[in-house]
Amino acid sequence: MNNGLMALQARLQHEFSNPGLLTRALTHRSFSLDHNERLEFLGDSVLGLAVADLLYERLSTLPEGDLSRVRANLVKQDTLHHLALGLGLPEVIRLGEGEARSGGHKRPSILADALEAVIGAVYLDAGFAVAQGLVRRLFQAVEIKSDMEAIGKDPKTELQEWLQGRKMNLPLYRVVATLGAAHKQTFDVECEIVELNFLERGIGGSRRAGEQAAAAAMLQTLKAKAAQ
């Protein structure tokens, strides 16, 4: 294991019994077929549960819906990117030549995904308790806001609650097109409400952002129809 990975283990306060997991967690799909996306998927769930447990403990009076919104605000890309920078992930992430030349080691989405993959790798290497301890240490310096600004509803949440309040099924989201070069893609996403036969589209720099844009467009349509 090289000095960079040894230093990262020290910052994580975890020495891997299977160092290959850490290497894979830091490997972008542009570098190798043995990349970090499955670990990212796993780490996203581990992170979500660990943060949910932290909020349940610290915000004992907050109702479920508000807890969900505080958690979403905490684990958003901006926060994970900041934490990844603090761990020094730009210095150790493995990128393909084209991605590296285009500045991929600075890209917030790549670094946020790598952090989730590292959390997933720690979970596989040592179990949930150790991964949870890592998440708690990472979020020690992150301000946990429970004010109205922090728990403001994003478009997807607002749309979901609008539909549930009318006993309707949740909307369907589909990526209909991926535009641009691999290192700078935009996602064209459809949002459909089947019962109403409504379909709207939105574009964003990630799938999640595209879904939020499509949900915002759908909310505008619903509010316009309601005002008629």
From Swiss-Prot:
SMART domains in alphabetical order: DSRM, RIBOc
Nuclease found in the keyword field = yes
Question: Which Gene3D superfamilies would you find in this protein's record?
Answer: 3.30.160.20, Ribonuclease III domain (1.10.1520.10)
One matching Pfam family, short form?
A: Ribonucleas_3_3
Per its UniProt record, the required cofactor names are: Mg(2+)
Q: Which residues bind Mg(2+)?
A: E40, D113, E116
GO BP: any one term: tRNA processing
Q: Which InterPro entries match?
A: dsRBD_dom, RNase_III, RNase_III_dom, RNase_III_sf
Any single Gene Ontology cellular-component annotation: cytoplasm
Q: Which residues form the DRBM domain?
A: 154-224
Could you name the active-site residues? D44, E116
The record places domain RNase III at 5-127
> What broad class describes the main subcellular location of this protein?
cytoplasm
* Enzyme Commission number(s): 3.1.26.3
**Sorted UniProt keywords:** Cytoplasm, Endonuclease, Hydrolase, Magnesium, Metal-binding, mRNA processing, Nuclease, RNA-binding, rRNA processing, rRNA-binding, tRNA processing
Record-level Gene Ontology MF annotations: double-stranded RNA binding; metal ion binding; ribonuclease III activity; rRNA binding
Summarize the subunit comment: Homodimer.
Q: Which family does it belong to?
A: Belongs to the ribonuclease III family.
Q: What does this protein do?
A: Digests double-stranded RNA. Involved in the processing of primary rRNA transcript to yield the immediate precursors to the large and small rRNAs (23S and 16S). Processes some mRNAs, and tRNAs when they are encoded in the rRNA operon. Processes pre-crRNA and tracrRNA of type II CRISPR loci if present in the organism.
Q: In its UniProt entry, what is this protein called?
A: Ribonuclease 3
Species whose genome carries this gene: Albidiferax ferrireducens (strain ATCC BAA-621 / DSM 15236 / T118)
